UniProtKB/Swiss-Prot annotation:
The keyword Hydrolase applies. Pfam families: AP_endonuc_2. Its EC number is 3.1.21.2. Keywords: DNA damage, DNA repair, Endonuclease, Hydrolase, Metal-binding, Nuclease, Zinc. NCBIfam families: nfo (TIGR00587), PRK01060.1-4 (NF002199). This is Probable endonuclease 4. It catalyses: Endonucleolytic cleavage to 5'-phosphooligonucleotide end-products. Endonuclease IV plays a role in DNA repair. It cleaves phosphodiester bonds at apurinic or apyrimidinic (AP) sites, generating a 3'-hydroxyl group and a 5'-terminal sugar phosphate. SMART domains: AP2Ec. Belongs to the AP endonuclease 2 family. Binds 3 Zn(2+) ions. It comes from Actinobacillus pleuropneumoniae serotype 3 (strain JL03). The keyword Metal-binding applies.
Amino acid sequence: MKYIGAHVSASGGVENAVLRAVEIGANAFALFTKNQRQWKAPALKADTIEKFKRFCKAHQFSPEHILPHDSYLINLGNPEAENLAKSREAFIDEMERANQLGLKLLNFHPGAHLNKISESECLARIAESINIAVDKVPNVIAVIENTAGQGSNLGYRFEHLAEIIDQVEDKNRVGVCLDTCHLFSAGYDISSLESCEQTFSEFERTVGFQYLRGMHLNGSKTPLGSRVDRHHTLREGTIGTDFCKFIMQDDRFDNIPLILETIQPEIWTEEIKFLRTLAK
């Protein structure tokens, strides 16, 4: 079965994200559990946690289909010791928040070397950051998102994801989220059914579908291999819609959250319906 939703607002409290997901006809969703542009946030209140869990149960959202995203400020591969420690502390807090809400996944961008350390050194720091976090917080899987490769961000090659996973001690506590806009911008062609087959076969060989815990379904405003991260709606932009058909008709993408981060929230309901029409 396909679980489709969007990254909905948690404004006014995380429990409201559940209701916003219901409004757009979703059976999966993503959210921030705190302000994503601040390092620190007030602790989640007991009544907020209770409401979130109650609303999820009432609307039949299971933890495997909810994909919280961490703060954009966090860089788990930071070359500077002080900033790395700050990022790790913030990431552990994000993991704890997800765990308090009964969630099983935490989606994050791997990190950037800032042109101060080598790629392999940065990837090793990211893996070490995951090891530290999962050692401190139980239950939650660290879900690495592939990137567009903008600036010095790593994670734009499948080999980067594999190198991080290889250095994570508990393989049950690490996973991957593939963003279609990022894939295309990083140079992985998904504009036809044939190119999708090639790209996802390469993912299987390099990383493995056993690690795929979620996807972000986005169109792109920029051409193949641009290394620029600019999302578009599903049916506009440079990729086309064959990738949507491929994903909706391939059972390797069953039972994971398929999340829209497309640029017009007012058409999310229609985009979800469109995806459902493509399913077998």
